[in-house]
Amino acid sequence: MDRPALPKSIKDKTNPWGPIILGILIMLGGALGKGSPHKVFNLTWEVYNQEYETVWATSGSHPLWTWWPTLTPDLCMLAQLAKPSWGLSDYPPYSKPPGPPCCTTDNNPPGCSRDCNGPLTYLTPRCSTAWNRLKLVLTTHHLNQGFYVCPGPHRPRHARNCGGPDDFYCAHWGCETTGQAYWKPSSSWDYIRVSNNASSSDATTACKNNNWCSPLAISFTDPGKRATSWTSGFTWGLRLYISGHPGLIFGVRLKISDLGPRVPIGPNPVLSEQRPPSQPEPARLPPSSNLTQGGTPSAPTGPPQEGTGDRLLDLVQGAYQALNATSPDKTQECWLCLVSSPPYYEGVAVVGPYSNHTTAPANCSADSQHKLTLSEVTGKPLPRKGSQDPPGPVQYHSGARQKYSLSGGSRGTMWACNTGLTPCLSTAVLNLTTDYCVLVELWPRVTYHSLDFVYRQVEGRTRYQREPVSLTLALLLGGLTMGGIAAGVGTGTSALVKTQQFEQLHAAIQADLKEVESSITNLEKSLTSLSEVVLQNRRGLDLLFLEKGGLCAALKEECCFYADHTGLVRDSMAKLRERLNQRQKLFEAGQGWFEGLFNRSPWLTTLISTIMGPLIILLLILMFGPCILNRLVQFVKDRISVVQALVLTQQYHQLKPLEHGRAIVK
């Protein structure tokens, strides 16, 4: 039997470009994973007990590391599942305060125990009854008692002798960094400050009503606002300054929720969407009402998804309609060409109004195209810079820096930053970073050519008297949002037509940007799929060279490892899809009732345009007809009176006057 031919050498099958491709994947993964610092997340600050169970939380939509609220949990909430001395060792979180309530002289609730107004004993304060919680309130608000807080594992090296959780991190004096005590403990490096959040009288009233009555106020210090490990949480110990120094453990952590699921690996669908513009469908005959025997009605199918050709054609058509509505003289004989090489969009800087918000509005929650950047911005901008920028010709808005706020531009505008496009700016991020942002209108790269230029191109002339000038749509329509439309309010039909044409172009731009986002997502999937193939080949080669210690040992080279950063990309794109849908809903909700009427009823446009002319003429006749008729009748009457006077005067003769001094004798 013949021996089978040996396969080719492994070296011949190994792609020499494999390490280079792997390095490019790592670089692209890291670049795509970097998001905008102004991106809005759903943040939740949680306070947990010693069992790491959340006992209090507050949520909000803000950029990362810009929202530092005051946390107000109750002291007895922190004692849930703590040591038995607190009386809540078996009490689950988020439960109502346990009873029984206190007895009063005016009203004794059923099952009450002890008189709330009676003298308190020196028993250890607990949280199991209203009377014990009242004792705890008087302890925490007492001038010579109170409580103190010691940091956990995040403390510096010189504080390592402060003990562990068994000592509540307060094994020695001097370990405390904050609290409510007569010596006012403080620190310059700890992350929080803790104090009482209610006066003694208010807390006493809440205790007598059988409620939680020992609220704390946990605020963040400057070192705490600079820390970026809040997602894993930090722990502290709290002890009462009374006999025995009872204590408990609590912690604070930040939860970033609403992260999208993992994207499955599959084929690249980018090329499948490269379709030419769709042709108009021919008119179809109405289906017969009689179904064939055994037949079933077909399920209605939705409209097919637009391809690349349709989206590009929509951009050109929207550009023409907007240009024709604003400058009809420029569209008599011209060519509008969509630029096929990047950059595909350009910004026109505008000086327009923007609003500040303490919470993220709907349009700010739209995680718009942070992966897209602008290489060209024209016009006179309204810039905003971070506080760490070098001095330059920029307008600082100091009023917005006094507290956290989000600056959102008017409709149709976006902020172009060095980190990408964003609908809103976080003033807290600007204070901490060196970002530079400009309020711009976004326009597609559509060049405007006159008819002579096209003729010269067709005739094949290669020599020009001067360099041909190509105007872009941004130069022709720049400032339409802040200038043309804003100034055209109240000018009648012309402003309404311009607004409608601009809205159509704006909708086409948003649709194209959405597809660009989808292409970036598909590119990220392709990179992940390619990295999986490369890693599988690497594992296969390691198995083949297992006797020699693996591929790296056989090649006598250093081993390379792949770090996958595409998880952040998947999370960002999932948020981006959700917020693009919110932006589309906001765009539809912003239309007036007049525009919405035409959008909901297409036949209404033809009907109104048909009957509007005769209806206006009829209204004019009804308004001015009686006046004109009265004037005509009055004119006829005047002419008739003159004719009657002439007829009467024809029957008489004028008498000659008598001479002076002559008498008539008969």
Curated annotation (Swiss-Prot):
Q: Where is the composition biased (Polar residues)?
A: 287-299
Q: Could you tell me the keywords of this UniProt record?
A: Cleavage on pair of basic residues, Coiled coil, Disulfide bond, Fusion of virus membrane with host cell membrane, Fusion of virus membrane with host membrane, Glycoprotein, Host cell membrane, Host membrane, Host-virus interaction, Lipoprotein, Membrane, Metal-binding, Palmitate, Signal, Transmembrane, Transmembrane helix, Viral attachment to host cell, Viral envelope protein, Viral penetration into host cytoplasm, Virion, Virus entry into host cell, Zinc
Segments on the Extracellular face: 34-607
Q: Which residues lie on this side of the membrane: Cytoplasmic?
A: 629-666
For this chain the motif CX6CC maps to 552-560
Native organism is Hortulanus murine leukemia virus (HoMuLV)
Q: Give the residue ranges for region: Receptor-binding domain (RBD).
A: 31-264
Q: Where is this region: Immunosuppression?
A: 535-551
Can you summarize the PTM annotation of this record? Answer: Specific enzymatic cleavages in vivo yield mature proteins. Envelope glycoproteins are synthesized as an inactive precursor that is N-glycosylated and processed likely by host cell furin or by a furin-like protease in the Golgi to yield the mature SU and TM proteins. The cleavage site between SU and TM requires the minimal sequence [KR]-X-[KR]-R. The R-peptide is released from the C-terminus of the cytoplasmic tail of the TM protein upon particle formation as a result of proteolytic cleavage by the viral protease. Cleavage of this peptide is required for TM to become fusogenic.
- According to the Swiss-Prot or TrEMBL entry, at which residues is a lipid covalently attached (S-palmitoyl cysteine)? C627
**Where is the short sequence motif CXXC located?**
334-337
Cross-referenced Pfam families: TLV_coat
Give the residue ranges for region: Disordered.
Answer: 265-310, 378-399
- Chain location of the short sequence motif YXXL motif per the record: 652-655
Site positions for Cleavage = R466, E467, L646, V647
One annotated GO molecular function is: metal ion binding
Coiled-coil spans in chain = 500-534
Q: Please give the residue ranges the record annotates as the region Fusion peptide.
A: 469-489
Position of the signal peptide: 1-33
In Swiss-Prot or TrEMBL terms, this protein is called Envelope glycoprotein
UniProt GO BP: fusion of virus membrane with host plasma membrane; symbiont entry into host cell; virion attachment to host cell
Q: Which InterPro entries match?
A: FMuLV_rcpt-bd, TLV/ENV_coat_polyprotein
Q: Which function does this protein serve?
A: The surface protein (SU) attaches the virus to the host cell by binding to its receptor. This interaction triggers the refolding of the transmembrane protein (TM) and is thought to activate its fusogenic potential by unmasking its fusion peptide. Fusion occurs at the host cell plasma membrane. The transmembrane protein (TM) acts as a class I viral fusion protein. Under the current model, the protein has at least 3 conformational states: pre-fusion native state, pre-hairpin intermediate state, and post-fusion hairpin state. During viral and target cell membrane fusion, the coiled coil regions (heptad repeats) assume a trimer-of-hairpins structure, positioning the fusion peptide in close proximity to the C-terminal region of the ectodomain. The formation of this structure appears to drive apposition and subsequent fusion of viral and target cell membranes.
